[in-house]
Amino acid sequence: MAPSQLPPIFNPTSQDIEMLLAAQCHLGSKNLQSHMEPYLWKTRPDGVNVINIGKTWEKILLAARIIAAIDNPADICVISARPYGQRAVLKFASHTGATAIAGRFTPGNFTNYITRSFKEPRLIIVTDPRTDAQAIKEASYVNIPVIALCDTDSPTDFVDVAIPTNNKGRHAIGLVWWLLAREVLRLRGTLASREVDWDVVVDLYFYRDPEAEENKEVVEEKVASAEEVGAGAIESGFAGENWDVAGAGAGVPGTAFAAASAAAGAASWEAEGGDWAASSAAPAGESWAEAQPTEAKW
């Protein structure tokens, strides 16, 4: 990292540098745009351009000072058409009070006042100048300053402040937005001092796949066994007014019915019983004719 020209109070901590390296914010692409050369540290033998994270930190602080200078936070619009940055801009907006546009940017948001989503922000922040090119183009028409997360191959046309970082990785994008939000809150005085850690973890800014989250926790239903319900309850046949099961098996569908069936099955089916034909025989001395009702006389 190159020597910093910032005051000592703004120097990054060792934890900040470790987080930037762990999130691979320093790894750019194999292509290099001419305007991004000042932020280049070196090129690896495999052709990957390495970004100077010292420059990344300086630009994060510069962008935070610009954001904190705007009186109304709602006049700041954060935009991300890239899926990896949509969760980050929503969290940034909730923590700083900015206006978020996560997903497709509707053409005319900044230039066509007839549209319902028309906005007049004083500053916009985009995740990727390439995917958010429409927003940058419209901002240039109405003289709106632009802050952008730029990779080594990102176009910098109409970008006023470029934060050099890896804008294609989910962790890199989330970390830069998290650092930017933390610095804004520090400059506004929301955080007491720079020695106090922010209680919001950086994981909240990372992209999460909805399908992966749904498949992560799959709970299989099962019927409680005798060990879960209790041997005493089965032996007693769940005698009581209610069929509630007290124990680990409570709340499992079909537990009481299964236990009662097991108790009934314990009884012997070989018990001696009476003849069903004998019980239905007519009493001796009584004729069937006598049992017929007398005919009514007309």
From Swiss-Prot:
It is found in: Cytoplasm. Residues 272-298 are annotated as: Disordered. InterPro entries: Ribosomal_uS2, Ribosomal_uS2_C, Ribosomal_uS2_CS, Ribosomal_uS2_euk, Ribosomal_uS2_euk/arc, Ribosomal_uS2_flav_dom_sf. GO terms for cellular component: cytosolic small ribosomal subunit. One of its GO terms (molecular function) is structural constituent of ribosome. Keywords: Cytoplasm, Ribonucleoprotein, Ribosomal protein. CDD domains: RPS2 (cd01425). It holds the Pfam family Ribosomal_S2. One of its GO terms (biological process) is ribosomal small subunit assembly. Component of the small ribosomal subunit. Mature ribosomes consist of a small (40S) and a large (60S) subunit. The 40S subunit contains about 33 different proteins and 1 molecule of RNA (18S). The 60S subunit contains about 49 different proteins and 3 molecules of RNA (25S, 5.8S and 5S). Interacts with rps21. NCBIfam families: uS2_euk_arch. HAMAP family: Ribosomal_S2_euk. Belongs to the universal ribosomal protein uS2 family. Required for the assembly and/or stability of the 40S ribosomal subunit. Required for the processing of the 20S rRNA-precursor to mature 18S rRNA in a late step of the maturation of 40S ribosomal subunits. This is Small ribosomal subunit protein uS2. It comes from Aspergillus niger (strain ATCC MYA-4892 / CBS 513.88 / FGSC A1513). The gene is rps0.
